Curated annotation (Swiss-Prot):
Monomer. One of its GO terms (molecular function) is tRNA dimethylallyltransferase activity. InterPro entries: Dimethylallyltransferase, IPT, P-loop_NTPase. It is an enzyme of class 2 (transferase). The gene is miaA. ATP binds at residues 17-24. It comes from Gluconobacter oxydans (strain 621H) (Gluconobacter suboxydans). HAMAP family: IPP_trans. Pfam families: IPPT. This is tRNA dimethylallyltransferase. The keyword Methyltransferase does not apply.
């Protein structure tokens, strides 16, 4: 790897892609190369209660280069796009002040797009609306609540999967608490994009290799104490609708701890659910560019630290970024 490269132009890197594609490893290597600060852009890795199941970077990696917005929220606090955007912008400013490159790393596309394209702010619908939405989701189920939402806010409901409890509950609370649907709010003028240049790298590995990696990693999570992590979370008696309680692996392992299913069955269910989620992630990223013009590249391989193939892949990515950073410096 080449000597660290100091970046003085207001540029930020984005490392995006589906779960288990190697984003954290790539971001770490890029941070070493470009004197970067890695900023979490994963909606589940913000929770301090879920270090293992969300595959947060290891302590040694976090010590090697600055890592920000990892494990900063309690599981009882629901994160939001608006909250993350504000925190990410603050961390980006800190990185630039320290003459470091902000490297936004994660698979939550809506978080990243809130920086690259801006964000419409939705007013807080209030505790009463939230309680009503969660109560209905538990009482009648997500599909019935989705049907109700379709009657009052078809524009929003038509874009949601009928079994997506979290998003349906959110849409219902916004409609009841503000008098307008999410789709309406998103059509209004909002916050502008971040005032910097983004250079993005999207990892899009082939499906079969990704599936094997997901299965292997979930096994490693179990060995590392994922069951104990979920047990500690359940002991807190938190609302099951909270995002942290719905993180991949939490519902499945909770069922094991309640004696409802054997561990192997739960493992298979979790791996399948994660696989389906990565397909949705990959589809989303294919339809939403995170860099303008030629400031984005797609790598069709999973990234690891050690493989010779990844070393060649890394050199291509580093050269791609260096060319665009140098061009920005010349233009400034």
């Amino acid at each position: 790897m080449n000597a660290p490269k100091t970046v003085t132009v207001k540029t930020a890197l984005i490392v995006a892609g589906p779960t288990c594609s190697g984003k954290s490893a790539l971001a770490l290597d890029l941070a070493r190369c470009f004197e970067g600060t890695v900023i979490n852009a994963d909606s589940m890795q913000v929770y301090r209660d879920l270090h293992i199941l969300t595959a947060r970077p290891h302590a040694a990696d976090e010590a090697a280069v600055p890592h920000r917005l990892y494990g900063v929220l309690d599981a009882a606090v629901p994160g939001s796009v608006a909250w993350w955007r504000s925190e990410a912008l603050r961390e980006m400013d800190v990185a630039w002040a320290e003459e470091r490159m902000p490297i936004l790393c994660g698979g939550t596309g809506m978080y990243l797009r809130a920086l690259t394209d801006g964000l419409v702010e939705v007013p807080d619908p209030g505790d009463a609306a939230r309680s009503e939405a969660r109560g209905l989701a538990e009482e009648i189920g997500p599909e019935a609540l989705h049907a109700r939402l379709m009657q009052v806010d078809p524009e929003t409901a038509s874009g949601l999967r009928p079994n997506d409890t979290q998003r349906i509950s959110r849409a219902w609370e916004v409609w009841t608490g503000t008098g307008h649907g999410l789709a309406w709010w998103r059509s209004q003028p909002g916050l502008p994009p971040a005032s910097c240049r983004f250079v993005s790298v999207q990892l899009d590995p082939e499906r079969e290799g990704l599936r094997r990696a997901i299965d292997s990693r979930f096994g490693q999570m179990l060995e590392a104490g994922a069951l104990e992590e979920v047990s500690a979370l359940l002991e807190r008696g938190l609302d099951p609708v909270l995002p942290a309680m719905r993180a991949h692996g939490v519902p499945e392992l909770a069922a094991v701890l309640r004696g409802e299913v054997p561990l192997e069955e739960a493992r298979k269910s979790a791996v399948l659910a994660i696989g389906r989620y990565t397909r949705r992630q990959a589809t989303w990223f294919r339809h939403h560019a995170l860099g303008k013009g030629d400031d984005g590249m797609i790598s069709l391989r999973r990234y690891t630290h050690s493989a010779q193939e990844s070393e060649s892949q890394y050199e291509k990515i580093e050269n791609f970024i260096s060319e665009r950073v140098d061009a920005a410096a010349r233009a400034s």
